[in-house]
Amino acid sequence: MSEVLVRTNEAPRLRVFQRLGELWRDREILANLARKELRVKYKSSALGVAWSMLNPALYLVVFYVVFTYFLPSGIEDFPVYLLSGLVPWTLFTTGLQGATTSVVGGSNLVPKVAFPHEMLPLAAIRAQLVNFFFQLVVLVAFLLIFGYPLFHRGIVLVPLALAVLLVFVTALGFATSALNVRYRDTGHLVDLALLAWFWSTPIVYPASLVQENLEGAFSLYLLNPVANIVLAFQRGIYGGVSRQALESLPAPGLTWYGMRLLVVGVASLVLLYFSWRLFYRRSGDFAEEL
């Protein structure tokens, strides 16, 4: 009697806790990849990581001149407002862009070295997290030099908002990095999306402006997860500057921002699960497609 072989093309199933254990076991690989990312970025650069601090400083000067002298924003203590939104936004954009191209950029490793491929987008985000802390130093130095209060009740929102931001950018990064292996236009689409995303996020204008002029659409405006995260950063940093600063934000109390972060955090975890599944399913074909 002849035997019949039946082949199945069933995709590998993601077992989250088992995979987390594997990632934790190989965490040194993640650290090495992140260090490599930073070394490559600042290779042959005279200023090195100082560029990560100069970038937000340059943005501050440009936006300050534009929105103070040419298009007055009317925002009290505008430099603090700008930096408190620009620093987390920069982490989001650079983290997502780096994650999107990470697997293609690691094409010399994927076919030759056995390691969890999730390490590539995670390392890209971790490298940008290092830059984020350097930029945070610029913000703290600015606050101290010009005598702005640094510690107040709202500061507790900053680490919470950072945690939610990291989950959200990781969720998006898993999806875009996996898609970019097969569809190389993904990176360009991400860049275009980020341009529109910037102007739909309250960084150079106050969210209260949207709240006052488009009251009916404000709830739709808050469907933007990054807007909620940036608002929490602004409440945690800018909201302690003065009473006038607090009045330019959508709500004075911390509870409103905490609830927004909770909603975005839960949604980001759900998105992370499904984008991770997508990445895991496609990772088996990376070596062939690269």
Summary of predicted features, one role per range:
Residues 1-290:
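Hydrophobic transmembrane alpha-helices and immediately adjacent juxtamembrane helices
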